[in-house]
């Protein structure tokens, strides 16, 4: 198998086993690379990611992890592809760097869980951020957004191995979409991409994955007010969404969805049926 660290998908010869028969064919595998984030010359964490849109990832991660509070506090991002993986050098303001050093967090090896590698349990709980409340979204547009998902999952079509985070406008049009083997990294890429170059800010975000605690935490850090998930919602995610004033909707598929928190942002529904969710 020929592999290049900067490619997202690798073509490979495989053998399909089906009903007792073996057939040789060509398949596609999602590439997974080690990505090291270094802030002002100091190593911070190593993660596993799809090797594309890594500048967006670095910016989104830096924002969603509250290493900086504004994109202007990120002074530069440099990528270096090596045989071992990708080294991302992020330069932040001295004030932010000093605050980062004081966190004393050991995040090495974090791959898919927002709590992995945290030295003390109490350090896993960050102060709750309450998002703004001005966003509104007509629920009728959700189905339109879902119909666009397949066309915005190019790597998933080939490999079946990636998650996607997609930004929606008021009409349910997908205006930005990012894929990654890690669902939280896909969201970081979306957050970073929408923070760069004066990109249009989405009204809502649609995840192809479940909505876990970390996904809601990242959404709150980015002031994402409406979060749709095509899969399930976890208990801690629900609790955090309630406290953070985030409208959280899960199981968005086949013309149905389950509303968990803050339904007042959704238009086009029978308001009486939302009494317990508002």
UniProtKB/Swiss-Prot annotation:
Residues that, per the record, bind Mo-bis(molybdopterin guanine dinucleotide): 251-256
Signal peptide: none
InterPro entries linked: Cytidine_deaminase-like, FdhD
Assigned GO CC terms: cytoplasm
Lineage: superkingdom: Bacteria
GO terms for MF: sulfur carrier activity; sulfurtransferase activity
Active site: 113
Primary localization class, coarse: cytoplasm
Database matches in Gene3D superfamilies: 3.10.20.10, Cytidine Deaminase, domain 2
Coiled-coil portions: none
Keyword Cytoplasm: yes
UniProt entry keywords in alphabetical sequence: Cytoplasm, Molybdenum cofactor biosynthesis
A GO BP entry: Mo-molybdopterin cofactor biosynthetic process
Annotated localization: Cytoplasm
NCBIfam families: fdhD_narQ
Family the entry assigns: Belongs to the FdhD family.
Protein function: Required for formate dehydrogenase (FDH) activity. Acts as a sulfur carrier protein that transfers sulfur from IscS to the molybdenum cofactor prior to its insertion into FDH.
Protein name: Sulfur carrier protein FdhD
Species whose genome carries this gene: Shewanella oneidensis (strain ATCC 700550 / JCM 31522 / CIP 106686 / LMG 19005 / NCIMB 14063 / MR-1)
């Amino acid at each position: 198998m020929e592999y290049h660290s900067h490619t997202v998908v690798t073509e490979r010869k495989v053998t399909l086993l089906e009903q007792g028969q073996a057939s040789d064919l060509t398949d596609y595998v999602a590439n997974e690379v080690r990505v090291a984030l270094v802030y002002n010359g100091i190593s911070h964490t190593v993660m596993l990611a799809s090797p594309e849109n890594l500048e967006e990832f670095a910016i989104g991660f830096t924002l969603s992890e509250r290493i900086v509070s504004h994109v202007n506090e990120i002074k530069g991002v440099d990528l270096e592809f090596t045989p071992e993986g990708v080294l991302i050098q992020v330069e932040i303001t001295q004030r932010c760097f000093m605050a980062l050093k004081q966190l004393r967090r050991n995040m090495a090896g974090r791959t898919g869980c927002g709590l992995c590698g945290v030295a003390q349990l109490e350090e896993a709980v960050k102060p709750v951020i309450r998002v703004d409340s001005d966003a509104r979204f007509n629920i009728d547009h959700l189905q339109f957004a879902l119909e666009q998902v397949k066309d915005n999952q190019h790597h998933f079509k080939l490999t079946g191995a990636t998650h996607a985070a997609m930004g929606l406008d008021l009409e349910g049009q997908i205006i930005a979409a990012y894929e990654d083997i890690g669902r939280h990294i896909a969201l970081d890429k979306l957050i970073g991409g929408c923070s760069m170059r004066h990109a249009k800010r989405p009204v809502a975000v649609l995840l192809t994955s479940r909505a876990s605690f970390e996904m809601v935490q990242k959404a709150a850090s980015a002031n994402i007010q409406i979060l749709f998930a095509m899969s399930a919602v976890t208990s801690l995610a629900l609790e955090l969404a309630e406290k953070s004033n985030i409208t959280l909707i899960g199981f968005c598929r086949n013309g149905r969805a389950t509303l968990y928190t803050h339904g007042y942002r959704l238009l086009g529904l029978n308001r009486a049926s939302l009494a317990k969710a508002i």
